[in-house]
Regions:
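C-terminal and inter-domain tail/linker signature
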Residues: 1-272
Length: 272
């Protein structure tokens, strides 16, 4: 069949992620994992590193599928340069550990592959929001799906945009960007709880594609008194992991979405 006029060639990385989303995640079929992931596949989320596809990753995935037997993944955005790919997504379903209560939550994953299979993923999911919903809060809406995620083209790297965003992260100014919305702030459209006053950051991953830059960072700083997480811990030095994808135009961050490990931070504060 000839390609439709004006259509670009599909990205092989995007084609792999189509299998990841449709054949593996949404069918809960872990037998697909060896077809799309190398044995050493590693998932990084918050302070956790799940090293090994069969030893660590697959059992964790099965635990999720057991809790949410009807779990669905909806793709909200895919950006790739061919070598790297970021996927913004929503997961939603009913938890059999919470009497069937339903929840929807966002996630952002930065994927690495070797041209054939997945090697690594730096990901954050908004489990804080999920917990609030499952504990009796109103379920959040599922964000609109990407119109044509599997037709997302590979775009060239943009070193200038990447350097600009790296500078925002290293200075701490990334948290002051009004166009960067975290977690469920997309519903109101306004930036809210910034959680910490940043002091330093470790960039775990960063790459660019066209005018987009994706990054995953571990940011250290003081817990803000106005944060919902503060309580008696205001001013305490904490570590907050976050993943994001932003769009840069003429040295300005004009759009962005991020997800933070607020639940992990809350649990660490409770243990301190």
């Amino acid at each position: 069949m000839e390609a439709l006029s004006g259509m670009h060639e599909p990205s092989p990385f995007v084609a792999l992620m189509r299998i990841y989303c449709n054949d593996y995640t949404n069918r809960h079929d872990t037998s697909v994992c060896p077809l799309i992931m190398e044995p050493g596949y590693t998932l990084h989320m918050g302070v956790h590193d799940l090293v090994g596809r069969d030893e660590r990753y697959t059992p964790a995935a099965m635990k999720q599928f057991t809790q949410f037997p009807g779990l669905c993944l909806t793709v909200n955005q895919i950006v790739t340069n061919g070598d790297r790919l970021v996927m913004r997504f929503s997961e939603h379903g009913a938890s059999n550990r919470h009497d069937g209560r339903v929840a929807a939550w966002n996630g952002i994953g930065l994927y690495r592959w070797n041209g054939k299979k997945l090697l690594e993923n730096f990901v954050e999911q908004d489990y804080f929001s999920r917990t609030v919903q499952l504990d009796g809060g109103d379920p959040l809406p599922v964000e609109n799906p990407a119109i044509a995620p599997w037709d997302s083209p590979a775009e060239p790297e943009n070193p200038a945009a990447e350097a600009f965003v790296r500078g925002l992260i290293e200075s701490g100014d990334i948290l002051d960007q009004p166009a960067l919305l975290f977690d469920d702030e997309w519903i109101s459209g306004a930036a809210g709880d910034r959680v910490i006053e940043p002091e330093s950051a470790v960039i775990n991953d960063i790459f660019s594609a066209g005018d987009h830059v994706a990054f995953h960072v571990a940011m250290s700083g003081r817990l803000r008194a106005d944060s919902v997480l503060a309580g008696d811990n205001a001013g305490e030095k904490v570590l907050l992991h976050m993943g994001a994808v932003v769009r840069v135009e003429q040295d300005e961050l004009v759009w962005g979405r991020g997800v933070r490990d607020r639940l992990g931070l809350k649990r660490r504060l409770a243990q301190s």
